[in-house]
Structures are given as structure tokens and as C-alpha cells.
């Protein structure tokens, strides 16, 4: 029994030494894990939430919807265009309630996921949501910007779980293009 434990302990030490060598080698070479982990499936989660993605068409001005640089994808600002093609418009604190702003931000999240699906071909390639910059068309005395942009963040966390939690800014704007209620930019990290 004693010799079996010693043999097992020896194998563990050798195994740990091998793992340590591999970690050190990876740190020296800059190698990172680029494989999508088993069981990670934002596409299936999206379906289970009943969220349907939609075509985003071409940009309305001289820009592109997304730019990939290395393992980061930068998304242009997107508005709350609904499935019927209409934008949710108005100023928070004057024309729209916090709840309506939350719903507008949720629509933006669906639109950004649609852009990512078109850009990447598969939402399962998204490693994590890195940064969200939410802009709220708000009256000067409106102060609940975070509650509005929660509509966006809540979708990302619902779809990507812990990987959907992100750094964020939620700021008020005097106006947004076309009087849309909310505009959001996003940065995501992807698996190669």
C-alpha cells in the first residue's frame, strides 16, 4: 500500500512538472488557448431565449458595421431598430420612460449580435464581451442612464453567461442620429 502511494505521488510530481514546463513554454512563446471550450454554446442559448437575429443591411453612412483586429472585433454604434424596421426614437426623461429605454437598449443588443453573427459566422466564436459604450439620448436632468443600458448588458449576460459580463460606460447625450433613443458600441474578443 505504502509503495503504491509513493508511486502515485511520483506520477503526480512528474505530471505537475510537465504541466509547469508546458505553462512556462506557453508564456515564453505567447501561445494562448484559441479553441472554443466544450459545452460553450451562445447560439443555443440565444435560441432558448427566443431571440431571433435579423439582417442589418448596409451601413447608412461611410463606415462598416465591424472591424476585426487580431482577436478583437470592434462594432460601430448601433441603434434600436426593431424587427419591423422602425427605430425607437425619443429622449429619455421627456418622451420615453426608463422601461422604454431599457427595451430600446435590448433591441440594440439584438442588432449587435446580428452584426456579430454576420461578421463571424458563428456566435460560439465569441470568447467574451470586453467593453460596451452605451449612449442615451437624454434630457439634461435625466440621471438613470445605467438603468437604460442594463437592457443591453442583460442580453449579453443572458446569452454569454460570465463571458458576457463587460466593462461599460453609460452616458447621456444631448441628441443621437435620427433622434434614436439609444446607441451602443461594443468590443468583443474572439476565439481564432
Predicted regions located by residue number:
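Short, polar/acidic, helix-capping and beta-turn segments at strand->helix junctions
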Residues: 17-192
